[in-house]
């Protein structure tokens, strides 16, 4: 599988070890940078990862910055990206299996490398489990990528709120 991998200057060392891990698992890594510790800006590399994924050059993407918050916000601005910032296996699997996430984000200063690699491996090997409900939710998320009149409608999510009120969602 082809995995796009990007980071900011704070976690270049972490990214390099993740790259080595992915290669050891037989994956092709598309390293979009950064490549050293010179101060840079995470949105550049979040965007590059997202573009590799939505163009089809990469199957999935991994973004890492200090907390993961900034680069994950940046990659989610690329139309077609569904990225989740995760720190645990449960969140990563939910993102892939239920929301068909195609990018995963991490805080390299928040989570240890070994756990990060385990989560990435599980994310890559997990499969999206399409249901009618998941498809509708993903369609609503996708609809938000383009500003349009429907989003201004205060009833945009009513269908899902009504199901909540009827007790159809369970944790």
Swiss-Prot record:
Its EC number is 5.3.1.26. InterPro entries: LacB (IPR004784), RpiB_LacA_LacB (IPR003500), RpiB_LacA_LacB_sf (IPR036569). It comes from the Bacteria. Keywords: Isomerase, Lactose metabolism. The keyword Transferase does not apply. It catalyses: aldehydo-D-galactose 6-phosphate = keto-D-tagatose 6-phosphate. Pathway: Carbohydrate metabolism; D-galactose 6-phosphate degradation; D-tagatose 6-phosphate from D-galactose 6-phosphate: step 1/1. Transmembrane segments: none annotated. It is an enzyme of class 5 (isomerase). The keyword Isomerase applies. GO terms for biological process: D-allose catabolic process; galactose catabolic process; lactose catabolic process via tagatose-6-phosphate; pentose-phosphate shunt, non-oxidative branch. GO terms for molecular function: galactose-6-phosphate isomerase activity; ribose-5-phosphate isomerase activity. Belongs to the LacAB/RpiB family. Heteromultimeric protein consisting of LacA and LacB. This is Galactose-6-phosphate isomerase subunit LacB. It comes from Staphylococcus aureus (strain bovine RF122 / ET3-1). The gene is lacB.
